Amino acid sequence: MKLSRRDFMKANAVAAAAAVAGVSAPTLAANLITSTDKTAITWDKAPCRFCGTGCSVLVGSQDGRVVATQGDPDAPVNRGLNCIKGYFLSKIMYGQDRLTQPMLRMTDGKFDKNGNFAPISWDQAFDIMAEKFKTTLKEKGPTAVGMFGSGQWTVWEGYAAAKLMKAGLRTNNLDPNARHCMASAVVGFMRTFGMDEPMGCYDDIEQADAFVLWGSNMAEMHPILWSRISDRRLSHQDVQVHVLSTFEHRSFELADNGMVFTPQTDLAILNYIANYIIQNDKVNWEFVNKHTQFRKGVTDIGYGLRPTNPLQQKAKNPDSGDSTPMSFDDFAKFVADYDLESVSKLSGVPKDKLEKLAQLYADPSKKVVSYWTMGFNQHTRGVWANNLCYNIHLLTGKISTPGSGPFSLTGQPSACGTAREVGTFAHRLPADMVVTEPKHRAIAEKIWKLPEGTIPEQVGYHAVLQNRMLKDGKLNAYWVMCNNNMQAGPNMNEEGLPGYRNPANFIVVSDPYPTVTAQAADLILPTAMWVEKEGAYGNAERRTQFWHQQVKPPEGAKSDLWQLMEFSKRFKVEEVWPAELIAKMPEVKGKTLFDVLYANGQVNQFPKEQSKGALNDEAEHFGFYVQKGLFEEYATFGRGHGHDLAPFDQYHEARGLRWPVVDGKETLWRYREGFDPYVKAGEGVRFYGKPDGKAVIFALPYEPAAEAPDKEYDMWLSTGRVLEHWHTGTMTRRVPELYRAFPDAVLFMHPEDAKARGVRRGEEVIVSSRRGEVKTRVETRGRNRPPKGLVFMPFFDASQLVNKLTLDATDPLSKETDYKKCAVKVVKA
């Protein structure tokens, strides 16, 4: 879309009116230019490049460069508002160290694992990549090649990657960095409901009576949603906000009931609430009897560590997600052990605060939304935490209805739309299908026009296991795209860097900037970013949003989609598929993987002319409307069974649509009659992801963390983010205003803990764990206020790699890393 000056000024007026109405008004970005008459700025819409909220922005470009951004007043998510990061989106692509040429480690003009980076051509880059991948495939087979992708990939980039890896190279060693943030939510949804992603939407905010935050600092991590919650709370005196965390943060400033609990004891608190509901006869029996079943989960499942780790060897049921049926009475007996007295003692939360929280959930007149993010998910029992929260909503019937429901928030712009829905996990296929299910593989092979048996049934290496296999020399040709896992991954010293520098391995990193991960690689490929390409993201409320390419990338930088498809041309089918597989479909003989995967009569069916009116480098290069072909093929996976997506062209007109989209209408609340087209008249509620239409209430206990403070390492360490920076700071630290606002990471610490160590605010300390150490400065004031015995350190700072300290323990069911709990000691530097 192109806006006239009048339209643009009108948009500003709408945003101003929203501010007058009581919503915090945005301050326009310092570089925003408003007179299109004088500057001839072209405006178009795009979703924000940062978190999973899915705010829409207006992007202003001039002379081939993005020069301004503003919150989109027509966007239902953010209603014209931006957070501080969104204000400066126009600057994220223009860091001085932007990469524009492939770079290979070389000595004397030849590849050398220990050489220095030198520029090469794209042909040279793909030549050596193809050589290394082909050699690995020939000598070790498909299990020795892999890819680490991203919840920041566009939908079609993730889909193209899934096709290349799972079908083309015939390996499931594809996993996204969303494994580190959303995998526990995925498994939690699947176990309880049989389908992934939230049943509610952001419209719940304006209809809820109360909000409960479980391990989610929405004030800094989802500030636009927090502005809507704040507006609801401050405009309605009876609305309540309850916040639970292992330390106080900015969200506590609005809390009616703030609770700081001992790490890992959220499990016990959740069971206490279920017990309170039962003991006080607040169970919604009509709902429970009709729509739920009870099961007891297997316990003592380990901590996702290496099999040689003593903790893993001690586990009686390592990695087991099994469960057995149980009655309501047995469930009631199970949670009866979690009484107010014992849970208060275990968690450290005063009894009156716990009881106030339980009363809120139990009150049938109160509509409650539960929000959580990494506090639940990055947890060695993260799946259990998700399941236990669902228990509370199911026992009370406060679910799938306007203003009530559990809601897992996402941290990346397309962790839902790309990682989860497309299925770029090591065990998944599109639309909740999995590689271990023969019927699902058959569906994928049919849609992709592949011979039976192309997709392997073996689950691939998940994120943490990929690093372990790199270190052990079992994963040898490896491509990292659109993430900075060397900085973001756990236990960097022992399990991260060794694999990248293993002489047996060839590591490729695609990125716009020379990140920590890129600098550990053998080959770096320069990447186009955000509106330098056409894209699609899926946000936390199931909203799929499209954008057009609005500017060209720097000469030499190519989109991830271009890289994936162009690289596929380097492989003949005979080089990667066994003869018996080719014999099932002789017509593929002599073809390249590009021909089979992307020129299959479906992906290439739309002429490039259909993308006229906007830039589209990929359409021009490949000769067809690549994005439309990939999307329409992908959409066939979900249509007709609850994952319906609208036709491609509809998304370019809308500000996003929430799936399932049936007959052009989006779905706001799933599983509820009157809102969800898959629930028939008279059913009321049906959790149709389960064969019997019933959700599962699980009996699951409190179990301790993998590592806790002891005499030597006497403090808990929790890691996370801050408002001004996003993840590893690759983009935000290159924005001068954001860098100045929070230039360096610090260690947030209780003043008495600092005093006991002879440390004053601002002084340097050494933080060490059993795995490594970092030097940083202490902060005893400000936004984060840890209790005694716990410290918090953000991970955005490449000069202070906090993940040298963290433990690579994971949830055994989801394989998601626990970044919130390990033991450290702090001494004055």
UniProtKB/Swiss-Prot annotation:
Q: Which Pfam families match?
A: Molybdop_Fe4S4, Molybdopterin, Molydop_binding
Name the positions where substrate binds. Answer: 795
Name the Enzyme Commission number(s) assigned to this protein: 1.9.6.1
- Cofactor binding annotation: Binds 1 [4Fe-4S] cluster.
Reported cofactor(s): [4Fe-4S] cluster; Mo-bis(molybdopterin guanine dinucleotide)
Tell me the keywords, alphabetical order. 4Fe-4S, Electron transport, Iron, Iron-sulfur, Metal-binding, Molybdenum, Nitrate assimilation, Oxidoreductase, Periplasm, Signal, Transport
Q: The 4Fe-4S Mo/W bis-MGD-type domain covers which part of the protein?
A: 41-97
Q: Where in the cell is it found?
A: Periplasm
Explain the post-translational modification.
Predicted to be exported by the Tat system. The position of the signal peptide cleavage has not been experimentally proven.
Cleavable signal peptide: 1-30
Where along this sequence does the record place binding of [4Fe-4S] cluster? 48, 51, 55, 83
What is the reaction catalyzed? 2 Fe(II)-[cytochrome] + nitrate + 2 H(+) = 2 Fe(III)-[cytochrome] + nitrite + H2O
Residues given in the record as Mo-bis(molybdopterin guanine dinucleotide) binding sites:
85, 152, 177, 181, 214-221, 245-249, 264-266, 374, 378, 484, 510-511, 533, 560, 719-728, 803, 820
Name of the top EC class for this enzyme: oxidoreductase
Q: Which NCBIfam families match?
A: NAPA, PRK13532.1, TAT_signal_seq
| Membership in a protein family | Belongs to the prokaryotic molybdopterin-containing oxidoreductase family. NasA/NapA/NarB subfamily.
Instruction: State the function annotated in the UniProt record.
Output: Catalytic subunit of the periplasmic nitrate reductase complex NapAB. Receives electrons from NapB and catalyzes the reduction of nitrate to nitrite.
| Subunit comment | Component of the periplasmic nitrate reductase NapAB complex composed of NapA and NapB.
Designated name of the protein: Periplasmic nitrate reductase
Organism name: Aeromonas hydrophila subsp. hydrophila (strain ATCC 7966 / DSM 30187 / BCRC 13018 / CCUG 14551 / JCM 1027 / KCTC 2358 / NCIMB 9240 / NCTC 8049)
- UniProt lineage: Bacteria, Pseudomonadati, Pseudomonadota, Gammaproteobacteria, Aeromonadales
Gene symbol here is: napA
